[in-house]
Regions:
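C-terminal and late-domain segments of enzyme folds
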Residues: 1-20
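Active-site catalytic microenvironments in core metabolic enzymes, especially phosphate/sugar-handling
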Residues: 11, 20-131
Length: 131
């Protein structure tokens, strides 16, 4: 799971890029609706702090998953805090592409643009159905 300590660690390390492996369409726990989830509000704040200087991309843990940050309210909240989507790139590919993007870019914004650009078929326009 995601907790505040993990985000604090990432902020302290001053990484240039981070990949978050979400569930399904790119979900992560950020909605607070009871005592058990009240720390999710702090997760939102830390996520926003992390994205100030760090490229943060969301990928899916589903084999044929595609991140879509405009479907559910939680994903919109994550997107609004500066997290970009890795489309249908697997976590491992997202990691390599992020490293390459950071190496090509002169700043965070350029790295985010490079990461989200399809260069060699690594991002499909539509995901195939494998059901």
């Amino acid at each position: 799971g995601m907790d505040v300590d993990k985000l604090d660690f990432l902020i302290e390390q001053d990484y240039e890029g981070v990949i978050i492996e979400g569930t399904g369409l790119g979900h992560m726990p950020i909605s607070a609706f009871d005592e058990e989830t009240e720390h999710h509000t702090e997760i939102q704040e830390k996520l926003e702090e992390l994205t100030e200087d760090t490229v943060v991309a969301m990928t899916s843990n589903c084999i044929h998953g595609r991140v879509d940050m405009d479907v559910y309210d939680n994903q919109v909240k994550v997107k609004n805090r500066g997290v970009i989507k890795a489309e249908d790139m697997h976590p491992e590919l997202s990691y390599v592409k992020l490293m390459w993007s950071l190496g090509q870019a002169s700043d965070k914004e350029e790295a985010e643009n490079i990461f989200q650009e399809n260069y060699n078929g690594e991002i499909l326009k539509r995901s195939e159905y494998h059901g």
